[in-house]
Amino acid sequence: MTNYYAEITGWGKCLPPAVLSNDDLSTFLDTSDEWIRTRTGIENRRISHVNTSDLATVAAKQALARAGITAQDIDLIIVATCSPDSLIPNIASMVQKNLEIEAAAAFDLNAACTGFVYGLETGTRLIQSGAYRHALIIGAERLSFYIDWAMRDTAVLFGDGAGAVVLSRTEEAVGLQNAKSGCDAQGRDILSVPKFGTSMDRFAADNGYWDFNFVGKEIFKRAVKGMGSAAAHVLAHAGMSKDDINVVIPHQANIRIIQTLCDLSGIDQSKAFVNIQKYGNTSAATVPIALCEAVEQGHIKAGDNILLAAFGAGLTWGAGLVKWGQRVEAISESDAALPECDKSALELLKNAIELCNARRDK
């Protein structure tokens, strides 16, 4: 029986053009650039003027071009998201429609910030079964839709964006080698949007607002523990040590979490790719966006061992060990882009900020 692997052959990203800076946030929140940067490492984040599926589609087109294949070669699409355009149907089908793919398995996956790592393992296992040849694995979020813009603790953290990879079937021992995923369900309430879904009062007058529960200190402790144990598991299972890792792609939630994860794992912080300062926490999109930029900037080289680690609501956690193939250059480039945005981030958020503040004042 042939042993198949799923090589990452293409990579792409999509960041909306409207930038919301820390100084912008200080115009309507009791905060400052210094307060946010020192506690989170974040300086800017992006605010989308389009739907989550639009972000996902642009990232997917970039990944396809860099893989040197067409959309018609794709037979599996997995979109990791907790902020879809619609509940029914899934947005993977919208991405499929946008790419004009006639027939492919397409579904969404919600594991919050760990979603891309879950999706990467799921896609890899399906390709290894021999049933699929090329897969699009996408992490895409429009978290600005959920944010209570009167609540400082969460308003400063999140941003919008998408990242994507193409997985291609191969007999070479590259791609995801080992993975460990799990969920600490006892802590599911400390990071949640609890009233979105059938648990909310559908006919409530204030049905345009949802609480965003966020217990920062407890999340920090559980994030480091979850990602750390998962990372240790995949390294041990692969018979590798921390010194064998060339690059770490961690979930971009908080610079302190990234630093603590590296310190507790004994991995040099210089190996961790960090771009949280530019985009904030884009949930399921952080890992693929960071992976894409790490390749673009030359941090990932042929044959590198890459450690992925993420943590999210649920409380989900996961890690994966990826063996990069021999190609780090794009075969082609895509000119795919979002439609132009004629508003600033503050202008895009104006109505949401006013309504959130009005509710807080009641």
Swiss-Prot record:
A Gene Ontology cellular-component term: cytoplasm
Region (ACP-binding): 252-256
Comment field on protein domains: The last Arg residue of the ACP-binding site is essential for the weak association between ACP/AcpP and FabH.
Record-given protein name: Beta-ketoacyl-[acyl-carrier-protein] synthase III 2
Family: Belongs to the thiolase-like superfamily. FabH family.
Acyltransferase as UniProt keyword: yes
Active site residues of this protein: C113, H251, N281
Alphabetical keyword list: Acyltransferase, Cytoplasm, Fatty acid biosynthesis, Fatty acid metabolism, Lipid biosynthesis, Lipid metabolism, Multifunctional enzyme, Transferase
Protein function: Catalyzes the condensation reaction of fatty acid synthesis by the addition to an acyl acceptor of two carbons from malonyl-ACP. Catalyzes the first condensation reaction which initiates fatty acid synthesis and may therefore play a role in governing the total rate of fatty acid production. Possesses both acetoacetyl-ACP synthase and acetyl transacylase activities. Its substrate specificity determines the biosynthesis of branched-chain and/or straight-chain of fatty acids.
Description of how the protein assembles with itself and partners: Homodimer.
Pathway annotation from the record: Lipid metabolism; fatty acid biosynthesis
Cell compartments where the protein resides: Cytoplasm
GO biological process: fatty acid biosynthetic process
The enzyme's E.C. designation: 2.3.1.180
Reaction catalyzed: malonyl-[ACP] + acetyl-CoA + H(+) = 3-oxobutanoyl-[ACP] + CO2 + CoA
Gene3D superfamilies named in the record: 3.40.47.10
PANTHER family, per database record: 3-OXOACYL-[ACYL-CARRIER-PROTEIN] SYNTHASE, BETA-KETOACYL-[ACYL-CARRIER-PROTEIN] SYNTHASE III 2
One example GO MF annotation: 3-oxoacyl-[acyl-carrier-protein] synthase activity
Signal sequence residues: none
Pfam families: ACP_syn_III, ACP_syn_III_C
Entry keyword Cytoplasm: yes
Source organism superkingdom: Bacteria
